[in-house]
Amino acid sequence: MATSLGSNTYNRQNWEDADFPILCQTCLGENPYIRMTKEKYGKECKICARPFTVFRWCPGVRMRFKKTEVCQTCSKLKNVCQTCLLDLEYGLPIQVRDTGVSLKDEMPRSDVNKEYYTQNMEREIANSDGTRPVGALGKATSSSDMLLKLARTTPYYKRNRPHICSFWVKGECKRGEECPYRHEKPTDPDDPLADQNIKDRFYGINDPVADKLLKRASTMPRLDPPEDKSITTLYVGGLGDTISESELRNHFYQFGEIRTITVVQRQQCAFIQFATRQSAETAAEKSFNKLIVNGRRLNVKWGRSQAARGKEREHDGSGDPGMKFEPVPGLPGALPPPPTEEESSANYFNLPPNGSAALVNISLPPPPGLSGPPPGFGPHMFPPMAPPPFLRAPGHIHYPSQDPQRMGAHAGKPSSG
């Protein structure tokens, strides 16, 4: 019972004819308006070797043309994209997905058994509603903490870039900027990611991308509860402008009674306070590194008490107001403190008590008739003249705002009556 394209054509009823491919968002591209060509029975499926309908399109500007690689039956068996063979729900390789849900692949590998298995699966798909996977995947657990942590929630369009130009690597490319291929240095041939096989990706064996993700999952950080049992608040970051308080409440209410939810739009974060510590620990355990709301992955951490924040400020040196720093060179020295006289506590301009205008103790130039000393002689040997006692200010002036003559403030004349 041969069903391949190069064999006899008597069994064409098992060839696949489809109207639209099964693709992920990354392979479709970011442009919602694409032109897609359809070729009926264009190629053999790279897994089951049956002819199927091939779709070809360009996912965007400066991207390479892509086409479907496996038939829709194989795609539905593994719930993967027909082009990249990554899981449609999590965006992960099949080996990572099967490890997360504890699924063991039991698909046959020989030609006859593979054809028989494919026909039985097609019959099962036809009898189902098409919304759930069939076979062993349909019986596996629906979710896994590891898969939620590793899941790719946003498309990665760099995967659609053109291949590297082999002529440019050899220094022989004459197209320049018009070359449709990338002019970049190729990856190291010894890199495990440089050798990938589509059959290994489908069967979930020897997949270097999956091995890299599984190693990352084994070293992922954990969220330990704080020692202070009075902390029942969780910090949720990365909200963006679309996530509201009601959406956070709809997710976190399942873990226990919520006391308050405070959303800080400016910082794009929220603080969720639970009524009990047990509810907060359950919410932190179930939501750390796997909380996705409206397609956004949110960051969940434990809130900190005021005492812990004060200790952190002391440790960093930012919260100690009495801490002394080294003086900055080149700056003038500090001004002397103002006089501490009890009677002039409210006298901001250092005015005398009788209200007469006070003259400031400002050094004046010498009188016109008195010239400077001749060369070779010292200054005049007489003490400087002091102002009369009734014109002497009670204190020194340290700031321009203390000078009444510069501020335009004059003391009022005493009334004659």
UniProtKB/Swiss-Prot annotation:
Residues 309-318 have a biased composition (Basic and acidic residues). One of its GO terms (molecular function) is U6 snRNA binding. Keywords: Cytoplasm, Developmental protein, Metal-binding, mRNA processing, mRNA splicing, Nucleus, RNA-binding, Spliceosome, Zinc, Zinc-finger. Residues 369-391 have a biased composition (Pro residues). Coiled coil: none annotated. A zinc finger (C3H1-type) spans 159-186. It is found in: Nucleus; Cytoplasm. SMART domains: RRM (SM00360), ZnF_C3H1 (SM00356). Pfam families: RRM_1, STL11_N. Residues 303-348, 369-417 are annotated as: Disordered. The C-terminal RRM domain and the zinc finger motif are necessary for RNA-binding. Component of the pre-catalytic and catalytic spliceosome complexes. Component of the postcatalytic spliceosome P complex. This is Pre-mRNA-splicing factor RBM22. The lineage of its organism: Eukaryota, Metazoa, Chordata, Craniata, Vertebrata.
